[in-house]
Amino acid sequence: MGKIIGIDLGTTNSCVAIMEGGKPKVIENSEGARTTPSVIAYQEDGEILVGAPAKRQAVTNPKNTLYAVKRLIGRKFDEKEVQKDIGMMPYQIVKADNGDAWISVRDKKLAAQQISAEILRKMKKTAEDYLGEEVTEAVITVPAYFNDAQRQATKDAGRIAGLDVKRIINEPTAAALAFGLDKGGKGDRKIAVYDLGGGTFDISIIEIADVDGEMQFEVLSTNGDTFLGGEDFDQRIIDYIIDEFKKINGLDLSKDAIALQRIKASAERAKIELSSSQQTEINEPYIAMANGAPVHLNLKITRAKLESLVEELISKTIEPCRTAIKDAGVKVSDIDDIILVGGMTRMPKVQETVKDFFGKDPRKDVNPDEAVAVGAAIQGSVLSGDRKDLLLLDVTPLSLGIETLGGVMTKMIQKNTTIPTKFSQVFSTADDNQPAVTIKVFQGEREMAVGNKALGEFNLEGIPPSARGTPQIEVTFDIDANGILHVGAKDKATGKENKITIKANSGLTEEEIQKMVQDAEANAEEDKRLKELAEAHNQGDALVHSTRKALTEYGDKLEAGEKEKIEAAIAELEEALKGSDKAAIDEKSAAVTTAAQKLGEKMYADMQAQQAAGAAGGDAGAGDAGHSHADSKPQQDDVVDADFKEVKDK
């Protein structure tokens, strides 16, 4: 059985880890970095760049460079969070036929799952390069507060990338696994995982217990905000820079895509620098033109200023913390350790806010960028059976229910219920002789169904005619270990039933997923074709160079006709190398090799002659050694002398 890898698919950065010799290992990517920017760029020639190369060219290609795509995964175009992003992102967010938020790139509409799959493919390749074998199975992490549609979409992204997603695991839970196995001492303890990443915020209260030598991780509660993270912090700085520049120069940079991309890079840099210094300078020369002259952006920003810009965002994380503590049935003083996860937790003000709320310093010995991927790899080793001393009990983050008479949300499974779980309840009809019922499934905490997230609907037909309230329809909710919901309805009188795996009533259809899988495979084929073409080019170039060199040295030993034949073959190969037809390059390379055969024979004969002459000279030298060294060749003489002296010196 191959390795099950652990992937942290992040909004800003992604990371991949494996278990090796019982220990987790984070794998460096092809650029030598342990994390990969979650950035994808679509080039004019059809090439797709992922990670650092994509991020580097973002300034010159803003409309086709996609980042923070995780904020759109499993979301509808009309959701207010998506509408907010439309005004902020340089790329074009569009409405798909199924109502989802997709992205338009180079006249093609792409689903967030398809784009995220490119990052997952890069993570898969990173692991394969390290292991030297194909990887097909993975555990992928999601924010704990992701709803069913977002989890399903993440799983679909894995499929498109060619991965069998063995488990979807919550990010804070993964971080707790990494902490518990590495730093967690003996005995029972309660920990809070505060996870503020690039696009999402989660808080989970987790109990780590030692049960008969087995380490048990039980999630007591979870809460969060799937649209709050580092990207929002960056946006506050971007808005501030644009406003200040406008005040000083009277120019509005918010409509200039290239200027915006430069400001975004500067804002992110400034945010990171202000975690370790009190002041930084934002310096972007030639940012705009005014009256035919260039205008430069030069602005000092202090840590205090940054904190005032983002204070409201940081305080937005505290209410979910309060709710999570309450839902877990514990007091703040019961928490033994606070684990910080996500790059944003490096910000001193965030650490200070967490300390003020929990009344103790958060731990600093967990790597906020890598802990989640490490936890995913640990869970992978549990699923593959390599590790048996560990049990993970996670929860569903939001209540699940169906719409009943009057638009009421009747909750079937309450939030923070340990998963996997199953629950059944009997319902009846609202009208006389009602032949069918529509089961509408919702997720959320509001009392009325319309205020919650609609996950899907299906019909149960063929109910025998009877008075309202008579038929007995049993509705069953079943949540698997991935947190994905399966719903069934059964008419107890007839035994008729209907079941569905809830997919967002938008979501991707099986046909769409299959098509995207094929597209991804075609891309892989195209990558392979380009690689083979590059290799053929390199070999062709090397052949031209070596044949030319040999022709210069030994060409005078050839007949004129043979020499011309070789030169003509080289010229044809050079012409083929200007194009991109691998078959033509291979054919012309073979022709050069055939034409240069006589040249090779001449070179070989020449070398043989030189060696023979050298050997003959050596024999003569050896025979005369007893009489006089002067008779042999000078270099032979040197060799013999050296040997002779070595022995003498001993």
UniProtKB/Swiss-Prot annotation:
- Gly residues composition bias: residue spans: 615-624
Stored SUPFAM superfamilies: Actin-like ATPase domain, Heat shock protein 70kD (HSP70), C-terminal subdomain, Heat shock protein 70kD (HSP70), peptide-binding domain
User: Compositional bias of type Basic and acidic residues: which residue ranges?
Assistant: 626-650
Q: Where is this region: Disordered?
A: 608-650
Classification via PROSITE patterns: HSP70_1 (PS00297), HSP70_2 (PS00329), HSP70_3 (PS01036)
Gene Ontology terms for molecular function = ATP binding; ATP-dependent protein folding chaperone; unfolded protein binding
The keyword Transcription belongs to this UniProt entry's keyword annotation: no
Phosphothreonine-modified residues are 200
InterPro entries in UniProt = ATPase_NBD, Chaperone_DnaK, Heat_shock_70_CS, HSP70_C_sf, HSP70_peptide-bd_sf, Hsp_70_fam
Q: Which Gene3D superfamilies match?
A: 1.20.1270.10, 3.30.420.40, Actin, Chain A, domain 4, Substrate Binding Domain Of DNAk, Chain A, domain 1
The record's keywords, sorted A to Z, are: ATP-binding, Chaperone, Nucleotide-binding, Phosphoprotein, Stress response
Summarize induction of expression. Answer: By stress conditions e.g. heat shock.
Q: Does the keyword Phosphoprotein apply?
A: yes
Note the PANTHER family from the entry.
Answer: HEAT SHOCK PROTEIN 70KDA
Q: What's this chain's function?
A: Acts as a chaperone.
Name the protein family: Belongs to the heat shock protein 70 family.
Q: What is this protein called?
A: Chaperone protein DnaK
- Natural source organism: Janthinobacterium sp. (strain Marseille) (Minibacterium massiliensis)
